[in-house]
Amino acid sequence: MNIQKKDVLEALRKITAPGEGKNMVDSGAVQNIVVFGDEVVVDVVINNPSLQAKKRTEVEVMKAIHGEVHEKAKVVVNVKVIAPEVPEIKGKPIPGIQNIIAVASGKGGVGKSTVTANLAAALAKMGFKVGLLDADVYGPSIPMMFDVADNRPQSVAINGKSFIQPIENYGVKILSIGFFTNANQAVIWRGPMASKALNQLIFESYWGELDFLLIDLPPGTGDIHLSIMQALPITGAVVVSTPQRIALADARRGVAMFKQENINVPVLGIVENMAYFTPEELPNNKYYIFGKEGAKNLAADLNVPFLGEIPLVQGIREASDEGRPTVLQDGTPQANAFRTLAQEVVKSVVERNETLPPSEAIRITNTAGCSSN
């Protein structure tokens, strides 16, 4: 048996490490290879601390060497986990919460909730403590996307007072109106009733320590948006749009709402969802079904950051239906896109907190419009 190190390297170039877009060699995951007779020792470094990722790495390396080099090679895989550094986030905390990010869209149907769910899961994978408040009162979909639709939050006693304890999955703490309503019935509430329910979720819940609380807002601009901004000091807003002109017109209005002088919530950036269609069997083919770079051009026109583009692929829909955010499927184009989005959001939050004062909740009056509190 004559095993060559170069053949082992070539075999490992055909697989990827969990969470990396490049192959295992070019990404730097393979640290060392030792070949002695029929024995091959491979030292690998990964960033994903989960036991599943470590086991998968071992199996993939062995499979690659046995399949491409020699089926009877004695393979030893040493996997070391080095978790990525968590960037320092400086924000104004409210009980335990460092940064509150509102995710909005001027128009329904652009994938705002899907983007929010994957952004939350991506931030959790990066090592942040993340909460997600589903404020889309009339169409709460976050519980289904996290496979917790059948769960019911329990109460927890903190300093002698009872609080709602969020449901947790994939490292994300979740609260939604959907946990407290019948899934087969429509939520028919007037604005004040919906706002009251949200206030209970916000102030009668125990989130613990969080780096980020993401809020999945309803589409458009209205009572719920104002109630949230009255209740909480929003660190910044992320606006989701497709490249389509009709969606961009509504996204422009959404940005304008946050930029109103007496609301003045910093816009962290715009995300272009469904940027292009890519068949999973032809990942290099791009079809711009809804137009090309519309949200990117809108961001430039409005002088706000462009946070990235998310492709339209079948895997995103399937992952949402299965209750497992697609960003958790390491190595796929859509997972890489959401991971890049999370990195850009963190970058934008850090820059915002270094250059702007802490946010304050706003106060709405009937006679004076919106004024800072």
Language-model features, listed with the residues they occupy:
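Switch II (G3) loop of P-loop NTPases
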Residues: 153-156, 177-192, 201-225
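N-proximal, solvent-exposed amphipathic alpha-helical segments enriched in charged/polar residues
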Residues: 1-31, 63
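Extreme N-terminal, non-catalytic leader segments
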Residues: 26-29, 36-38, 43-104, 349, ...
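Conserved catalytic-core segment of NTP-binding enzymes
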Residues: 54, 59, 211-212, 218-318
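Phosphate-binding loop that captures ATP/GTP phosphates
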Residues: 123, 128-184, 202
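C-terminal boundary of histidine-terminating zinc-finger modules
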Residues: 322-332
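A short, charged, Gly/Pro-tolerant segment at domain boundaries
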Residues: 344, 354-373
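Walker A/P-loop phosphate-binding motif and the immediately C-terminal alpha-helix
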Residues: 100-136, 263
